[in-house]
């Protein structure tokens, strides 16, 4: 397996922070199975829901989404989002469907009881997207591509440029809390079936 050959332990629990892309989620689940905890990007979820409501309704819906995701407690956040979902069913059913789709995965960091700063960082894909936007800017200047190797070199160059602008993520000192939470979670093991002889 490619991941193993590159030194990635696929048997450890991991937190994957992704956007709503179905193909990426499917690949993660196929590769890591129950050892993959998926955190869907709350920023993408907000945008998707707000795209369905009218301009007049956006401020209040955005305020309720922000308030729900700002809650520290999983049950309280889930209850607030479920309440918003019920409101949206009357206001705009397509917005309600957008909110409901993958909703539970937008609350993974809440279920893990992450400290507020780290939870805010891990709740969106903004960290990686800012790096990729720099790569996009660097690669935009390339006029002729000469095969896959050159593409890899340009992307690598873009990431090296992006690296110079990296800062520590908010909540970086709390990462051991995440590591402990992941270590205590054990995916369901294989059931061992024992047979007894009939007497």
Language model features with spans:
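Generic hydrophobic-segment detector
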Residues: 9-10, 62, 92
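Acidic/histidine-rich catalytic cores and adjacent linkers
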Residues: 22, 70-199
């Amino acid at each position: 397996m490619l991941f193993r050959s590159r030194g990635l332990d696929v048997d450890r629990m991991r937190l994957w922070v992704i956007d709503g892309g179905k193909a990426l989620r499917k690949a993660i689940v196929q590769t890591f199975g129950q050892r993959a905890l998926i955190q869907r990007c709350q920023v993408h979820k907000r945008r998707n829901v707000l795209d369905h409501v009218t301009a007049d309704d956006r401020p209040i819906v955005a305020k309720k989404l922000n308030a729900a995701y700002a809650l520290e407690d999983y049950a309280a956040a889930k209850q607030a989002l479920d309440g918003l979902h019920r409101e949206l069913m009357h206001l705009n059913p397509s917005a309600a469907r957008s909110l409901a789709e993958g909703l539970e995965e937008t609350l993974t960091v809440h279920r893990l009881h992450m400290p507020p700063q780290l939870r805010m960082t891990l709740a969106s894909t903004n960290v990686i997207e800012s790096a990729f936007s720099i790569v996009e800017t660097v690669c935009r200047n390339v006029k002729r591509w000469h095969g896959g190797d050159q593409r890899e070199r340009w992307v690598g160059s873009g990431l090296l440029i992006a690296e110079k602008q990296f800062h520590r993520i908010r909540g970086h000192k709390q990462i051991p809390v995440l590591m402990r939470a992941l270590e205590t979670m054990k995916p369901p093991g294989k059931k061992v079936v024992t047979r007894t002889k009939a007497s």
